[in-house]
Design a protein with these regions (language model features):
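Beta-strand-enriched, solvent-exposed domains that form extended recognition/catalytic surfaces
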Residues: 3-175
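Exposed low-complexity, polar/acidic, P/S/T/G-rich flexible segments that act as propeptides
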Residues: 24, 141-220
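Sequence-level detector for tyrosine residue identity
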Residues: 36, 49, 78, 95, ...
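Catalytic cores of extracellular degradative/oxidative enzymes
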Residues: 197-201, 205-328
């Protein structure tokens, strides 16, 4: 149809290039449909909603894409938005991070995404002599919870993510945790194999990184666990060790993680209540917006320590080291 000639004007449609581009986009998505999942961005999470929070500078609005990429890798981020055209601006920023980074070299904004295909080359965030790269995140920068965005990442390496923020019941939350633990149990066994796979190819992980496998610095070891008020960005092997390191069955490990995350949620809500913050601050029929809980989150991250430190509080995160991650 894009090549049909109008019988009146004798010309092709003026939108021919756009139509062909959209067809090409659709074909690429279909080609990768089985291996690249769709992430629905939560537009209820934004710094724009948290202007009343005096400590908002220490909160993080990132949403994980479940993709880790090395510096220099080409990645395509496809953004869909109902009612928008290809090339339209969005309220989505893409961030690249350095896995196990120093406090001052954690992240770099890559671009503000547009509707449709966004092809990017992952930048180097750090100059450390380890694998350069890390997890990719999106931050919603708008203030309209009715906006809808769906994102698909083509390229990089996918890793397991647990996000329980949209679970409406305890049963649904438990099911998500069970599925995550099952995926994690399989994933942790093959991280080194993934690093070394197709090592003779210039496009392989080991070739691009130029380094041998290092358990503590391989970006494939990432995972994110997203709660209402907290996001853990820590090594997946340490998560697994903490719940299954004593011979626990998969069901026991899942229950252990479920209870641990519930305890963290309850503790943070207690802290926020102590500060006078509440999910629905209503008194005498009046809603007090300044007393609402923040939408953005605390972020505990696997980071490189400076001399004498076992943890630190940075601008967008709380940094802890390898051994501490297994204690969470």
């Amino acid at each position: 149809r894009a090549d049909e000639v109008d019988p009146v004007s004798g010309e092709m449609t003026p939108k021919r290039d756009l139509i062909l581009k959209e067809l090409d986009n659709a074909e690429k998505i279909l080609d990768h449909n089985e291996s690249y999942k769709v992430i629905h961005i939560d537009t209820g999470v934004s710094k724009k909603y948290d202007s009343h929070i005096t400590f908002s500078a220490g909160l993080n609005g990132w949403q994980p894409l479940g993709t880790a990429a090395l510096a220099g890798e080409k990645v395509v981020v496809y953004v869909g938005a109902p009612g928008r055209r290809t090339g339209d601006n969005t309220n989505l920023d893409l961030y690249a991070t350095q896995y196990h980074s120093e406090a001052s070299h954690l992240q770099k904004k890559v671009t503000s995404l547009k509707v449709g295909f966004n092809e990017i080359t992952v930048p180097a965030v750090s100059s450390l002599g380890v694998e350069k790269g890390g997890a990719l995140y999106i931050e919603y920068t708008g203030n309209n919870p009715n906006e809808i965005y769906a994102v698909r990442v083509i390229g990089g390496s996918q890793y397991p993510v647990l996000d329980v923020t949209r679970a409406e019941t305890a049963e649904e939350r438990k099911e998500l945790t069970d599925a995550y633990v099952a995926e994690m149990a399989e994933y942790v066994q093959k991280i080194e194999e993934m690093h070394n796979e197709n090592s003779d190819s210039e496009d392989s992980h080991s070739a691009i990184s130029g380094l041998d496998y290092d358990e503590r610095n391989c970006i494939l070891g990432a995972t994110d666990i997203v709660l209402d008020q907290m996001m853990f960005s820590i090594p997946i092997k340490q998560v697994y060790k903490s719940i299954a390191g004593n011979g626990e069955s998969q069901d026991e490990a899942a229950e252990k993680l479920y209870q641990s995350l519930m305890a963290m949620d309850e503790m943070i809500h207690l802290f926020y209540q102590h500060k006078g913050l509440n999910a629905a601050p209503v008194t005498g029929g009046k809603t007090y917006e300044k007393d609402k809980l923040p939408t953005t989150r605390l972020n505990i991250r696997y980071q490189r320590m400076f001399a004498g430190a076992f943890m630190y509080a940075g601008g967008l995160h709380i940094g802890i080291e390898w051994d501490s991650c297994a204690l969470l």
